[in-house]
């Protein structure tokens, strides 16, 4: 048996990324109708599913995971992360470099970015009383590695938008956040806005930023969504009744593809541009539920 992790369409071929019985990394290919399915690639290392893989120029970049015995650890196993790629034209595999271990390096869904033939990787290291976060830049051939951004705070990267890297800086107890933009071409950081609570799922389209955030009232966590307009500073928010999660998956000429999850449903649907910026998620045309 195996588990499906991701699926995507590229050059009229359907690709599915799976984890096998031994946690090995597998890629299956099929026609666009799902027929003629076959195993195209397998690797002994595992896919780190905490980080979304990135497709660029026919090459799939991902974070690989391997376990080794560790006599200094009470658990006896150490999970090592590495930066890898698979060329979809011939399924050649390349492992670029080691990038940390699971017990010392914290990474997120959008930690891996590609821009102008360079790979950007965001990670954080936590100790008992401090946190250190960094964004490193690698040449796509792995020949050079440099740090472009680092700070003693918790950082999560969420998007690369036209050469601007959007990220959130949070304090130790997640009670305050600031949403920032870093210029990948010229350097320099701009603070777009600040908000009480923990901000996540940041997505910038044009001058407007969609985001999720959570605050605590002492008894429970309050989940909300917001839209911040960088052109005039206006901030529209809506508070959810219960534990609700919304993320933006993509955009079409007809609207925005969203993932909506609460205690009763786990759904994917298309939301019109007007309803999206008005935060009227109940108007989405949900096509698929898990």
Question: What spans do the regions from the language model cover?
Answer:
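A short beta-strand motif characteristic of beta-propeller blades
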Residues: 1, 36-43, 92-103, 144-150, ...
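N-terminal "mature head" segments of proteins
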Residues: 1-48, 57, 97, 104-105, ...
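Repeated scaffold domains used in trafficking and secretory/extracellular systems
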Residues: 2-10, 46-57, 102-115, 152-163, ...
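Structural motif
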Residues: 22-28, 68-85, 123, 127-137, ...
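Short loop/turn segments that connect beta-strands within beta-propeller blades
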Residues: 31-35, 86-91, 139-143, 183-187, ...
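Intrinsically disordered, low-complexity segments enriched in Gly and acidic/Ser/Thr residues
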Residues: 152, 156, 170-180, 185-255, ...
